[in-house]
Amino acid sequence: MPSVVVVGTQWGDEGKGKITDFLSSNAEVIARYQGGDNAGHTIVIDGKKFKLHLIPSGIFFPEKISVIGNGVVVNPKSLIEEIAYLAENGVSANSLRISDRAHVILPYHKKLDFLQEEAKGDKKIGTTIKGIGPAYMDKAARVGIRIADLLDKEIFEERLRTNLEVKNREFVKMYDSEPLEFEEIFEEYYEYGQQLKKYVTDTSVILNDALDAGKRVLFEGAQGVMLDIDQGTYPFVTSSNPVAGGVTIGSGVGPSKISKVVGVCKAYTSRVGDGPFPTELFDEVGHQIREVGHEYGTTTGRPRRVGWFDSVVMRHAKRVSGLTNLSLNSIDVLSGLETVKICVAYERSNGEQITHYPASLKELADCKPIYEELPGWSEDITSCRTLEEIPEAARNYVRRVGELVGVRISTFSVGPGREQTNVLESVWGV
């Protein structure tokens, strides 16, 4: 029962969608296990760019099953729009399966997300205002509405009415904001549920049956380890667990059925929104990396913050997600730089060096990155298909990344296309 988990090892936007799409060719089931439409992944097929937020990358393979697991929070409106977007581009969603246990994002979640973020003033955490956090809050508070509830008119009406009464009191009394209308939400979202009904099932059964039958299953995470609510740069994190351990909770598959964990990273680092970023660049080199790498958020369109590769972050990701393999993306973006740097440790103001990522943001603010400098390369490597074809300086960089992280590099990418992903070692064993 071979199964592979794909996780982002930085702050998201590492190219997980591209790697999932690439690995999907040898998988029979592809499942998303956490997050919501706050995450975006871009896939390039035959030169055409597709941007998805909820539906797994495997949807481009009609013979494979694509699963939205119970750990995902689903905005029905966004999902229906995404299905329509795919249809307009000749891609069918007939192979999609949605967990009946997944929780639903409703208009009051998005409104609350906005109001809470605005109330923080200059202490905003950089939420995408998609309602993700409030939906997970309701789930933990045991007042959430699941897909199974959305499909049952009586249950949906009862729970929506109860929840909206509470939320409207909060909007009016705490935020001096207008209440939401029950009827409008009820009619609109019940109809969304009916449109999605044909895709809804117990996806835990599908996934476990597939694994028990020896089928190859690929699990696709959203965001990245450094945005994990437990292991990330709290409170500048998402509301779920992108780490590999999140698979078992968010898909209904036991940990004994996970074979390999592929960590996806870029040859540099990027981040959207606020929060600590030790290797961030503010100079012309940072600007060049941002422009060459097209570092603008898939969901928000916001310019991403960029910086040098941070092996301290990567070793943290390796430890907390149990990485077995590494997929190194966007090496081509570094072409043209005279020198390239890798952060190998942090130095505190008292001169002490540390090689682990601190939990305390105050402690982290006291740290400066210690860099190892390597020669850069000027050649265009976007057409290279083997490690031997890329310049020696680029080869040395790739090898050094693997050494510092302590994980085998199974693939490296020199561009956004499928054909620009090069295999050093198959994680499927094929």
From Swiss-Prot:
The active site is at residues 13, 41. It catalyses: IMP + L-aspartate + GTP = N(6)-(1,2-dicarboxyethyl)-AMP + GDP + phosphate + 2 H(+). The keyword Magnesium applies. Substrate binds at residues 298-304. Pathway: Purine metabolism; AMP biosynthesis via de novo pathway; AMP from IMP: step 1/2. GO terms for cellular component: cytoplasm. InterPro entries: Adenylosuccin_syn_GTP-bd, Adenylosuccin_syn_Lys_AS, Adenylosuccinate_synth_dom1, Adenylosuccinate_synth_dom2, Adenylosuccinate_synth_dom3, Adenylosuccinate_synthetase, P-loop_NTPase. Keywords: Cytoplasm, GTP-binding, Ligase, Magnesium, Metal-binding, Nucleotide-binding, Purine biosynthesis. The keyword Calcium does not apply. One of its GO terms (biological process) is IMP metabolic process. Binds 1 Mg(2+) ion per subunit. It is found in: Cytoplasm. One of its GO terms (molecular function) is GTP binding. IMP binds at residues 13-16, 38-41, 128, 142, 223, 238, 302. Its EC number is 6.3.4.4. Plays an important role in the de novo pathway of purine nucleotide biosynthesis. Catalyzes the first committed step in the biosynthesis of AMP from IMP. Homodimer. Belongs to the adenylosuccinate synthetase family. PANTHER family: ADENYLOSUCCINATE SYNTHETASE. This is Adenylosuccinate synthetase. It comes from Lactococcus lactis subsp. cremoris (strain MG1363).
